[in-house]
Structure formats: C-alpha cells, structure tokens
Amino acid sequence: MSSGSNSGGLMSSAGLVRYFDSEDRDAIAIDPKTVLAFCVLFGVFVQILSLTVA
C-alpha cells in the first residue's frame, strides 16, 4: 500500500468539514423538540382530516 492511496479520503472529507462549518454560522437554529412537536401535530392533523373526509 502506498501512502498516496490513503490521502484521497482526507482530502475529500476536508471540503465537507469546511462546508458544514460555514453552514452552521448562517443556519437558523431550531430546537429538535420543536421539530418533533410539529411532526406530531401534523400527524394528528392528518388523522383528523382522514376521519372527517372518509
């Protein structure tokens, strides 16, 4: 095994680290509990609609 074959993984992941680093500074921070509550409420809303329509 040559050392050149292992360097490709590090080079490709370095760009991803830089990309996600810049995304974190500008991203809107939403609490995971808020997302979960929205999903549960949306599911309840869909169930109520399916009961009233059918």
Curated annotation (Swiss-Prot):
Residues 1-31 are cytoplasmic. GO terms for biological process: protein transport. Pfam families: Sec61_beta. Residues 54 are extracellular. The keyword Zinc does not apply. Its main location: membrane. Keywords: Cell membrane, Membrane, Protein transport, Translocation, Transmembrane, Transmembrane helix, Transport. InterPro entries: Preprot_translocase_SecG, SecG/Sec61-beta/Sbh. GO terms for cellular component: plasma membrane. It is a single-pass membrane protein. The chain crosses the membrane at residues 32-53. Involved in protein export. The function of the beta subunit is unknown, but it may be involved in stabilization of the trimeric complex. Belongs to the SEC61-beta family. HAMAP family: SecG. NCBIfam families: PRK01253.1. Component of the protein translocase complex. Heterotrimer consisting of alpha (SecY), beta (SecG) and gamma (SecE) subunits. Can form oligomers of the heterotrimer. This is Preprotein translocase subunit SecG. It comes from Halorubrum lacusprofundi (strain ATCC 49239 / DSM 5036 / JCM 8891 / ACAM 34). The gene is secG.
